[in-house]
């Protein structure tokens, strides 16, 4: 059975409010086993979104993503076979959602968990199989060795390549796409270059226009439920144009922390 892209973690100074944003706008369901002192977890029925407090020395935004596999030992062996320099490390026991952390050839970090084991205690496990009208469709990664990283995720995790006529790589687990975009400093002409790493998340929705209306209603109900402005000023306009090059989204916004989100039907 191919691996499953099972969660995304977003670091935020306002992590409870940011989780509430996803719950309110995208209909994600809150975990029935909350751990509010550590994180707030919501889910769409397939992917869990873990809103975590930003720790010292760390940046806000998308922190990492998670992959669920059938056999951890076999997966770690596959990682080492792909490149002996790649490593995995066991996570502390207080982290119930994943057993190990690992990285790809460009040092993009991801979590590893095994299906049907006891420590998957949260929304990732409890909502399995339920489809919600608004759900995460893709996770975008912008990285220098895009082709090599794509080979890594295909060979190690069995993700399926999707053919598209552009220079990006699209890998699917059957429901969610890992989009790998080549990082080039030339793409950042007219703006501050962003570090390589996780770039944005995308949602598939029943109606883009309804999402826009729901955003207006949400801000009217609670003025704190407002994402960051996009496309303002020359640099902001350049950032938005780069973001809009992703062919998987047609409406662009951010969460409260500034994490980039694109939406399509």
Task: For every predicted segment, state its role.
Residues 1-16, 62-65, 115-150, 177, ...:
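N-terminal beta-strand motif that seeds the catalytic metal site of vicinal oxygen chelate
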Residues 2-48, 94, 140-185:
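Core segments of cupin and vicinal oxygen chelate
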Residues 4, 61, 96, 135, ...:
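Exposed loop/turn and edge beta-strand positions of beta-sandwich/beta-sheet ligand-binding modules
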Residues 5-8, 26, 40, 62, ...:
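Fold-core signature of tandem repeat domains
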Residues 14-15, 69-73, 145-146, 206-210:
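Helix N-cap motif at beta-to-alpha junctions
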Residues 46-50, 57, 107-110, 120, ...:
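Short, charged/polar, Gly/Pro-enriched secondary-structure boundary elements
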Residues 80-132, 170, 216-265:
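Vicinal oxygen chelate
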Residues 147-231, 235-245, 249-251, 256:
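Structured core of small recognition/catalytic domains
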């Amino acid at each position: 059975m191919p691996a499953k892209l099972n969660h995304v973690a977003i670091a935020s100074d306002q992590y409870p409010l940011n989780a509430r944003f996803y719950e309110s706008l995208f209909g994600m369901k809150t975990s029935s086993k909350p751990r509010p002192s550590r994180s707030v977890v919501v889910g769409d029925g397939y992917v869990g979104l873990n809103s975590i407090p930003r720790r010292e020395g760390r940046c806000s935004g998308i922190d990492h993503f998670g992959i669920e596999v059938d056999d951890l030992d076999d997966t770690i062996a596959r990682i080492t076979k792909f490149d002996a320099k790649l490593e995995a490390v066991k996570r502390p026991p207080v982290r119930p959602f994943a057993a190990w952390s690992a990285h790809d050839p460009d040092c993009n970090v991801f979590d590893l968990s095994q299906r049907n084991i006891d420590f998957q205690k949260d929304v990732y496990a409890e909502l399995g199989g339920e489809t919600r009208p608004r759900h995460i469709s893709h996770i975008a990664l912008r990285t220098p060795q895009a082709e090599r990283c794509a080979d890594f995720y295909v060979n190690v995790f069995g993700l399926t390549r999707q053919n598209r006529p552009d220079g990006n790589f699209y890998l699917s687990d059957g429901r969610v796409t890992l989009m790998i975009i080549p990082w080039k400093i030339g793409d950042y002409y007219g703006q501050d270059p962003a570090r390589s790493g996780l770039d944005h998340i995308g949602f598939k929705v029943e109606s883009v226009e309804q999402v826009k209306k729901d955003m207006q209603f949400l801000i009217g109900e609670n003025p704190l439920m407002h994402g960051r402005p996009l496309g303002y000023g020359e640099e902001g306009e350049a950032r938005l144009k780069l973001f809009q090059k992703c062919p998987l989204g047609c409406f662009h916004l951010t969460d409260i922390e500034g994490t980039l989100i694109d939406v399509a039907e």
